[in-house]
Amino acid sequence: MTEQVIIIGAGQAGLSTAYYLKRNGIDPLILDANPTHGGAWLHAWDSLRLFSPKEYSSLSGFMMPKTREAYPSRDEVIDYFGKYEQRYQFRIERPVKVLDVTKVEDTFHITTDNGEFLAKAVVSATGNFSGQFIPTFPGLERFIGDQVHSADYKNNTIFSGKNVAVIGSGNSGSQILAEVSQIANTHWFTNHPLDYLDDELDGRYLFELSTKRYYAAMKGEKLENTDDFSKIVMVDSVKEARERGVLIREEDIESFSEHEIITANKRIAIDAIIWCTGFKTQLNHLKGLQLNTDLQSLTQGTRSTQHSGLWLIGYGEWSGYASATIIGVQKHARETARQIAESFELIAS
């Protein structure tokens, strides 16, 4: 059987696109590598909370139910995704890992660990979680302490009493540092000076700023003063860490030894490293399509510039402003579904 549309991934981008496709009369099949609902949120650390209230953290059509606190927790997001799937009765097969996608004439052949699937259109919505990025430093291969990427960090328990280097800024770096510093001696290394949003601002402000940038770009204009996008959001845990005086940036890393990080002026004993250095887009599951390596030219909006019938959504700025966020991906999912529906109408005619 050849499906009209197959969506790869059942995170926020995949579910949002499925919702809008169903509104356009198309019932897509979703292939999800995870064993259950939740997308990348299944892999987030235990204490993670969104920094926007549920009104700014909901998928289209169904508001997130009331949460225990102002900002939804990781577990509440996972539970909400499950309710969303049930509400709209999406067809989802899991766990199914996509190994490759090829195209023969006008049909996509999707090779998985559970057989082959065929589709006339494919939406890749796998996110960036599998592309964990760790930078290189002189001597890093000599370091013999524990290392974990933020994608694999769960809680602070195993770091009790240790000297821990948190490498990387952003919201993951600040929040993990805040948690680990409660029971460990932490050192924070970032590649630029630390900068924070005002205490009263949260994700709502960033969404509104992103929306302004989106509409400015639609008009061919450029929104000035976008530095706030890179600033750290002052959630309660980070405010508390500030009060304890642990939000201190160390000197730049020059090299590593077996047990130390070496800077220009000191050697710092380190037992463990937590890498909060983000993710790189990983599209190995599409290798058979031989996509461009330049992400900026890979899509026009979310539509592939190389293959008709292929869309990529939710990977970050190159696939749409704020498209890696729950609320930000909605407008891109709506447009993606519209384009797909339109393509089938054109084929039918």
Residue ranges and their predicted role:
Residues 2-10, 15-34, 38-40, 69-171, ...:
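Flavin (primarily FAD) cofactor-binding/catalytic cores of flavoenzymes
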Residues 63-69:
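A short acidic, helix-capping loop that chelates divalent metal ions and anchors anionic groups
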Residues 36-44, 48-61:
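Redox-cofactor-proximal catalytic regions of oxidoreductases
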Residues 59-63, 314-316:
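A short small-residue
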